[in-house]
Design a protein with these regions (language model features):
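N-terminal, post-signal-peptide region of Sec/Tat-exported proteins
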Residues: 48-78
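N-terminal signal peptide c-region/cleavage motif recognized by signal peptidases
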Residues: 14-16
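Short, solvent-exposed, polar/charged sequence segments at loop or secondary-structure edges
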Residues: 67-110
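Short catalytic/metal-binding and nucleic-acid-binding patches
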Residues: 8
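Second-shell loop/turn segments in exported
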Residues: 42-53, 85-86
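Bacterial N-terminal signal peptides that target proteins for export
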Residues: 1-5
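C-terminal/domain-edge helix-coil "capping" segments
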Residues: 20-40, 57-61, 68-70, 97-102, ...
């Protein structure tokens, strides 16, 4: 058994999976970011206006970054009513890619902010192929601090080092 495990480890080491190239510019349906408050504070006090504003700010940051990299953001108005009924497009059994394909996009981009506490937040982005539904790039980063600056840095890091990471 030890020999089999050692052989498998050697095989995997000798034949690494090739790194996937960053996605090429195309048409992207960005469904914005969703804020999910899992904290006790949220359960007791409800939605905080500064976090709603911060979610919009971070969505704009992601959209601007995509455009700066040569992507075309397709209008999502034709699916807006359906999108309103979806709690979280990041986790909807492929509804994001189905809507992106319907909109004529090459990619579906979704993201979320999970607030664990006022100190710990988890930021996530997912870029999927609209036709196949395959996840092309996805990443999560935990940040410390619930400020505009920590959110900006977190999403900038995700875009630069995960979604558009070079080999």
């Amino acid at each position: 058994m030890k020999a089999a495990v050692a052989s498998l480890a050697l095989l995997l080491w000798a034949n690494p999976v090739p790194a996937q190239e960053p996605p090429t510019p195309g048409r992207v349906a960005f469904f914005g970011l969703r804020f999910i408050d899992m904290s006790t504070e949220g359960a007791m006090n409800g939605v905080r206006p500064d976090e709603s504003t911060r979610t919009k700010m971070a969505s704009a940051l992601v959209a601007e970054d995509m455009v700066a990299r040569g992507f075309e953001l397709v209008p999502i108005d034709p699916v807006a009513k359906r999108l309103e009924t979806i709690t979280n497009p990041t986790d909807c059994n492929g509804c994001d890619t189905a809507m992106a394909a319907e909109l004529g996009a090459d990619y579906a981009l979704t993201g979320e902010v999970r607030k664990i506490s006022n100190l710990i937040l988890s930021l996530e982005l997912n870029l999927r192929d609209a036709e196949s539904g395959q996840t092309l790039r996805a990443g999560t980063v935990d940040i410390r601090g619930n400020t505009d600056e920590t959110w900006r840095r977190g999403f900038s890091y995700l875009l630069r080092n995960i979604i558009f990471r070079q080999r």
